[in-house]
Amino acid sequence: MNYIGIDIGSTASKVVVRGSKEAYFVLPTGWSSKETAQTIRGRLREMEINVEDEATKVVATGYGRIVVDYADRTITEITCHGRGGRELAGENCMIIDVGGQDTKVISLRDGMVYDFLMNDKCSAGTGKFLEIMANRLGVTLEELFDMAGQGTA
């Protein structure tokens, strides 16, 4: 059995394969998320992984998740981050995703997404967004950086 996670983001696409085969790769998304999804299918085929095989399950997330026509399931980025954060850092943690188009801050409590914030501007305002998030979380920007440095995942 192979489990494949595909995140087609606005600037980069990430793929992780777990199971009887293990692999990961990153590639630029480019102008067309749909073409990127097909490029990923081709790369997996080169690795002798057939996404149509009954023993392969594909989950897609990210801005381009809808165009991964071979995905068995699509999941929002917030949900994926929550599950990944719980797996890597425990049931109570904070995840910060600085992406190509936005930044998300996700808070987990008891293993569930408790709250999340997202900037509503392009990534040009990312620094200001971190400052606003620190203020919202009741910490200084320096404390936020220290907290990030203490992360183990």
Where are these regions (language model features)?
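Short beta-strand-loop/turn "lid" adjacent to the catalytic site in phosphate-handling enzymes
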Residues: 19-29, 48-79, 114-116
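Glycine-rich phosphate-binding loop plus the immediately following alpha-helix
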Residues: 110-149, 153
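Predominant activation on well-ordered alpha-helical scaffold segments within soluble catalytic domains
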Residues: 38-42, 79-86, 127-134, 142-145
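Short glycine-aspartate micro-motif
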Residues: 3-7, 55-57, 93-97
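Short glycine-rich, Thr/Ser-proximal phosphate-binding strand/loop in the N-terminal lobe
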Residues: 2-43, 113-122
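Conserved phosphate-binding catalytic cores of ATP/NTP-utilizing and phosphoryl-transfer enzymes
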Residues: 63-115
